[in-house]
């Protein structure tokens, strides 16, 4: 699976860490897991950049994105066709390098 964002000058081992986030899953009914949070925070601490993961309703990570120190892009995520009035079923968990909780 592909990591989105500006990946220039990212060391190979960190790119692998980002790609490995796709192997994790989150149990239904949970927003995230300790392991996922720890891995995302470790990458954020090293790069001083936001990391975002997008999960479907089953807890499968469907997208990983790397942002800059202030923002991370929300790419278009492919999903099954649904009514135009239904929710996407995709949730986002992301980090803030500065610790600022405001979006």
Regions found by a protein language model. Give the residues of each.
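Short, structured surface patches at the beginning of a domain
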Residues: 25-28, 53
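Active-site-proximal loop/helix of nucleotide/amide-processing enzymes and allied scaffolds
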Residues: 1-23, 76-103
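Structured interaction and signal-relay segments at domain junctions
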Residues: 62-77
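Short, basic/aromatic recognition patches
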Residues: 27-42
